[in-house]
Every structure is written in structure tokens, then in C-alpha cells.
UniProtKB/Swiss-Prot annotation:
Localization, UniProt: Secreted
GO cellular component: extracellular region
Keyword annotations from UniProtKB, A to Z: Secreted, Vasoactive, Vasoconstrictor
Function field: In response to lowered blood pressure, the enzyme renin cleaves angiotensin-1, from angiotensinogen. ACE (angiotensin converting enzyme) then removes a dipeptide to yield the physiologically active peptide angiotensin-2, the most potent pressor substance known, which helps regulate volume and mineral balance of body fluids.
Gene name in the database record: AGT
Name under which the protein is recorded: Angiotensinogen
Family note: Belongs to the serpin family.
GO process terms (BP): vasoconstriction
Length: 10
């Protein structure tokens, strides 16, 4: 699981 997910996809 991701600890932090970016609000936007790179």
C-alpha cells in the first residue's frame, strides 16, 4: 500500500 498518494499522476 502506498503511504502517500500523489493527487496527480506523473
Amino acid at each position: 500500500d502506498r503511504v502517500y498518494v500523489h493527487p496527480f499522476s506523473l
